[in-house]
């Protein structure tokens, strides 16, 4: 299925000059949603993945169904203060400041094979922070997979050394 035709583009959102890729139109289409999950799962099925990690918030929408389909567990990465148990955090740079992500300290066991799934690769800051948290807990980041990659933002450059795949590239 051509998933590109199911992505709505909204010009000048969230600010002028941005062409926002809205995945809600894909998610509400049962056949497109199933196709997205199937295609992402096909990229991972032979990699013996133990855990799929999805960063807040759209990584949950992409990662959880793929984890189910490939028979892996799912772990959410959250903004600070959203996880109830003991956590570790990783702070990363944004264009205008910093942000931080957290994971439960017992979410990943040493040696577990982990795939990171998210909806969109832009600059790569969120996924680098996610990978660092996984590695700090002893997990092995086997694959990083996206529905969409915005190639002109060069997020793939900061992910050199990782296996990165995207279904759609703009």
Curated annotation (Swiss-Prot):
Coiled-coil ranges per UniProt: none
Species lineage: Bacteria, Bacillati, Bacillota, Clostridia, Peptostreptococcales
Keywords for the protein's UniProt record, in alphabetical order: Cytoplasm, Glycosyltransferase, Purine salvage, Transferase
Chief location: cytoplasm
Subcellular location: Cytoplasm
Gene3D superfamilies, sorted: 3.40.50.2020
Primary gene name: apt
Protein name: Adenine phosphoribosyltransferase
Function: Catalyzes a salvage reaction resulting in the formation of AMP, that is energically less costly than de novo synthesis.
Assembly behavior: Homodimer.
Organism listed in the record: Alkaliphilus metalliredigens (strain QYMF)
Single GO biological process annotation from the record: adenine salvage
Domain of life: Bacteria
Annotated GO MF terms: adenine binding; adenine phosphoribosyltransferase activity; AMP binding
Catalytic activity: AMP + diphosphate = 5-phospho-alpha-D-ribose 1-diphosphate + adenine
InterPro entries: Ade_phspho_trans, PRibTrfase_dom, PRTase-like, UPRTase/APRTase
Family: Belongs to the purine/pyrimidine phosphoribosyltransferase family.
A Pfam family recorded for this sequence: Pribosyltran
Pathway entry: Purine metabolism; AMP biosynthesis via salvage pathway; AMP from adenine: step 1/1
Recorded GO CC terms: cytoplasm
């Amino acid at each position: 299925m051509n998933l590109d035709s199911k992505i709505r583009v909204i010009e000048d959102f969230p600010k002028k000059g941005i062409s926002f890729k809205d995945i809600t139109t894909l998610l509400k289409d049962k056949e497109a949603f199933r196709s997205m999950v199937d295609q992402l799962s096909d990229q991972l099925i032979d990699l013996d993945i133990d855990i799929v990690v999805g960063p807040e918030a759209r990584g949950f929408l992409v990662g959880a169904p793929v984890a189910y389909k490939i028979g892996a567990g799912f772990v959410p990465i959250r903004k600070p203060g959203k996880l109830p148990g003991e956590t570790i955090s990783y702070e990363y740079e944004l264009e205008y400041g910093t942000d931080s992500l957290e994971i439960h300290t017992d979410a990943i066991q040493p040696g577990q094979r982990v795939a990171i799934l998210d909806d969109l690769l832009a600059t790569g800051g969120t996924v680098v922070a996610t990978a660092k948290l996984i590695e700090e807990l002893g997990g092995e980041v086997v694959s990083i997979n996206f529905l969409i990659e915005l190639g002109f933002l060069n997020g793939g450059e900061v992910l050199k050394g990782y296996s990165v795949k995207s279904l759609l590239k703009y």
